Amino acid sequence: MSEKGTRWRPLELFSAYLPAALSVLLGACLYITFSVGQWRSLDVPSWDLAIFTEAAKSYSHFQAPIVPVKGPGYNLLGDHFHPILVLLGPIYRFFPSGLTLLVVQDLLIAVSAWPLVRLATKQAGWLLASIIGIGYVTAWGFQGAVASQFHEIVFALPMLAWASAAFVEGRWVATMAWSAPLVLVKEDLGLTIMMIGLILSWRGRDSIKSFAYPLFFAAFGVIAFVVTIKLLLPAFNASGTWAYSLDGSQGRGNVTLIERALWPSQKFGVIAMAVLGAGIIGLASPWFWVILPTIAWRFLGSVDYYWDWKHWHYNAILVPILLGALLDAHRRWSEREQSDISRGLGWVISRQRPFVATVALAIPCAAALITAPQLPMWKMTNPGFGAVSSRMAQVQEINSLIPENANVETDL
């Protein structure tokens, strides 16, 4: 190796990993700062944190996740199927606080930036990758998740991020390996696995083996979903049923499936942000359609929280998938492959595709910047954000009066 090559190699390694490392660090700092601010100001958007804190406490003592907040003797595995939450047990044992769960969630979201920003660095260089990383960690879906506090779906984010990167790189086995544990996160993610299997089969259709094996993976996802909602959830639920329903027609009268999917109009906000999150050109990647099962159950459901794009945790799971679709389209456009993408979008002539692909990488970051004032973390610009609530002393006094292991009934 030449002296020049030896001298520049450390710099090349530094620039190769720096955007991903800084993205993870930026995300962790932003999220944890926001969570600590919420904690200090007693900002409680829902009862989810109390529910999952009780589950973590039970797991930390090697007990079933009995959650009195949901009802006497209520087993949380009968609500949603999320056995992966057992991983919270050892952490909670050493740091027994609801704030622990918030920090765990913040770190899991931040870490999910690593594989995708690393991939972006390989494809587009450190500068564009840095822009992508900023857009990723400040994305609409993640802000809503952090603000609404802990939810089990956060465990799916690193899995989907690494699966997305593997898909773009054409590593089918790795894609399936990273996706398979999704069945341990939440019951509906079996349908996401089904979609991933179908997409892999489509992408590998030129080979019998590459076409057939992903179909078995898709079947695994369907079977996992059916077994979970028909057998496992009813077994843990006191009423012997699945606590939720795919029927979203309640309260909507006699409407068609299309009307249920597209009405009310606030759903278009989610669609618009998804398109921007994929840099527009990501729609041409088959990976974009991995979001379809999640979008379907949300839009067909009757709970208006499902349709919101600014708040709650429901959009977080879309973010790594959308960036994966963008990077997949970018790779193929940049290489000027005569692929399904170039044929499907023939209005973009061959010499324009690399330029359009490069510009598209900045769209998610631009969307994050434009929508920032409407998103939860904008609160951090307020001078009083994170100040200790005036009610804190009263809360601490009341807590001191409650005996250990006593149950207290209250509202939010």
Enumerate the predicted regions with their spans.
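Perimembrane helix-loop-helix junctions
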Residues: M1-R7, T192-A219
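Start-transfer (signal-anchor) and selected internal transmembrane alpha helices
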Residues: M1-T33, W172, A212-F217
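Signature aromatic-anchored transmembrane alpha helix within multi-pass, membrane-resident enzymes
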Residues: A21-L25, L127, A218-V222, W333-L375
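Transmembrane-helix motifs of polytopic, lipid-linked glycan transferases
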Residues: L99-Q123
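Specific aromatic-rich, kink-prone transmembrane helix
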Residues: P115-R118, G135, V154-W178, I193-G197
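Hydrophobic, aromatic-rich transmembrane alpha-helices
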Residues: K267-I295
